[in-house]
A protein has these predicted regions:
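Conserved glycine-rich Rossmann-like NAD(P)H-binding loop of the short-chain dehydrogenase/reductase
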Residues: 30-47
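Substrate-binding pocket helix/loop in short-chain dehydrogenase/reductase
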Residues: 97-98, 105-110
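The beta1-alpha1 cofactor-binding region of Rossmann-like NAD(H)/NADP(H)-dependent oxidoreductases
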Residues: 42, 63-75, 103
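Conserved glycine-rich cofactor-binding loop
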Residues: 16-18
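Active-site loop of short-chain dehydrogenase/reductase
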Residues: 7-8, 82-83, 128-133
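A short, exposed helix-loop element centered on a Lys and neighboring polar residues
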Residues: 121-122
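Conserved NAD(P)H cofactor-binding loop of Rossmann-fold oxidoreductase domains
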Residues: 90-94
């Protein structure tokens, strides 16, 4: 059981299911405290967080935050004073024919899968560098 206040802290986006959930579990097993985010499935994410806390004895915070929205990501980072690991896992896909996809849908996919990595990383790096200064 890892209840140390100075345990490493990891943030995982898109952590309510699939790869993000598996990454969160691996980090919890390794003793990391976690901040987990997702855009639409907060009840699922809260269940994941509760299970990880119970199973691994870590602190796990679930937050609704659309990684493609800079303001939502800024709210997540506003309460952090350090961060050791960032996992940019949030992602979506478009199911259908390319010829049926609108420009808006394409922009949403790009914003979620690519721009979100920029939004989170630009806020995470300064916190990560604090540990090394």
């Amino acid at each position: 059981m890892n209840t140390r206040k100075n345990a490493p802290l990891a943030l995982v986006t898109g952590a309510s299911r699939g790869i993000g959930k598996a990454i969160a579990e691996a980090l919890a097993e390794a003793g990391y405290h976690l901040i987990l985010t997702c855009s639409h499935t907060l009840p699922d994410l809260q269940e994941v967080a509760a299970c990880l806390e119970e199973k691994y004895g870590i602190t796990c915070t679930a937050m609704a935050a659309d990684a493609s929205e800079p303001a939502a990501i800024e709210k997540v980072f506003a309460s952090l004073d350090h961060l050791d690991v960032l996992v940019n896992n949030a992602g979506i896909s478009y199911i259908g024919l390319l010829t049926d996809m609108s420009v808006e849908e394409w922009q949403h996919v790009l914003n979620t899968n690519l721009s979100s990595c920029f939004y989170t990383s630009r806020l995470a790096v300064p916190l990560m560098l604090l540990k090394h200064s």
